[in-house]
UniProtKB/Swiss-Prot annotation:
<keyword id="KW-0472">Membrane</keyword>
<feature type="transmembrane region" description="Helical">
    <location>
        <begin position="53"/>
        <end position="73"/>
    </location>
</feature>
<comment type="similarity">
    <text>Belongs to the PlsY family.</text>
</comment>
<dbReference type="GO" id="GO:0043772">
    <property type="term" value="F:acyl-phosphate glycerol-3-phosphate acyltransferase activity"/>
</dbReference>
<feature type="transmembrane region" description="Helical">
    <location>
        <begin position="142"/>
        <end position="162"/>
    </location>
</feature>
<keyword id="KW-1208">Phospholipid metabolism</keyword>
<dbReference type="GO" id="GO:0008654">
    <property type="term" value="P:phospholipid biosynthetic process"/>
</dbReference>
<protein>
    <recommendedName>
        <fullName>Glycerol-3-phosphate acyltransferase</fullName>
        <ecNumber>2.3.1.275</ecNumber>
    </recommendedName>
</protein>
<feature type="transmembrane region" description="Helical">
    <location>
        <begin position="82"/>
        <end position="102"/>
    </location>
</feature>
<keyword id="KW-0443">Lipid metabolism</keyword>
<keyword id="KW-0444">Lipid biosynthesis</keyword>
<dbReference type="GO" id="GO:0005886">
    <property type="term" value="C:plasma membrane"/>
</dbReference>
<keyword id="KW-1133">Transmembrane helix</keyword>
<dbReference type="InterPro" id="IPR003811">
    <property type="entry name" value="G3P_acylTferase_PlsY"/>
</dbReference>
<keyword id="KW-0594">Phospholipid biosynthesis</keyword>
<keyword id="KW-1003">Cell membrane</keyword>
<feature type="transmembrane region" description="Helical">
    <location>
        <begin position="112"/>
        <end position="132"/>
    </location>
</feature>
Length: 218
């Protein structure tokens, strides 16, 4: 029963739409109707300021950290496979939140939280790829896709070459599974990139004016 309860709580905690609620409370807006229409930290930061976007980022990462960390403490007999299951459920909760009609965010920050507990070195490598990609391409979506693709590779190479540990196929397989999910949640971003209509990581002047006009019409 403890396994089922913890699994349920992992999904529910992951489904808490912090970005949506914070934008609604402090920005007086439905964030799903502005910018990229995503509930994540980037869209919140771009739409109402990073003093709100950064807390959303921290909270979304925490949604991945706590289910994995606490399941390892309170249900140690479940081992890494159960920790991963709780992590996957948290990510799925973020992507398919019952609070938002089973729609949600991309799952990138929550995925980061999951693997920060289990494989921090791999996460730091993926964060580095994310930052370099954004620096070069100027799109958060491309950074997220590249980071999710490289996370399993960084994990495998860091385990073998740096930590001299055996690669856990539970962890590697879960990384691949979630990475595929993250890429699928970025389908619209990919289409916008191909159409040259994707929003930049930092607003330019035209986007700023358009955003102000949208808010003024509300």
């Amino acid at each position: 029963m403890n396994f089922a309860i913890f699994a349920f709580l992992s999904f529910i905690s992951g489904s808490i739409p912090f970005g949506y609620w914070i934008a609604l409370r402090f920005g007086k807006m439905d964030i799903r109707k502005f910018g990229s229409k995503n509930i994540g930290a980037t869209n919140v930061g771009r739409s109402i300021g990073w003093k709100f976007g950064f807390p959303v980022l921290v909270l979304d990462v925490a949604k991945g950290i706590f289910p994995v960390y606490l399941s390892g403490i309170y249900i140690p007999e479940g081992g890494v496979p159960f920790q991963l299951a709780c992590g996957v459920l948290a990510v799925l909760g973020h992507m398919f939140s019952p609070f938002l009609g089973f729609k949600g965010g991309k799952g990138v920050a929550t995925t980061l939280g999951v693997f920060l507990v289990l494989t921090p070195i791999a996460c730091f490598g993926a964060i580095f790829v994310f930052l370099v990609t954004i620096k070069y391409f100027k799109f958060v979506s491309i950074g997220s896709i590249f980071a999710s693709l490289t996370l399993p590779l960084v994990y495998a190479f860091s385990s073998i070459l740096l930590l001299h540990e055996e690669v856990s196929y539970w962890i590697l397989g879960t990384m691949v599974f979630i990475s595929i999910g993250i890429i699928l949640t970025h389908r619209e971003n990919i289409f916008r990139i191909l159409n040259r209509s994707e929003l930049f990581a930092v607003k330019n002047e035209d986007e700023e004016r358009n955003g102000d006009s949208e808010r003024n019409r509300r």
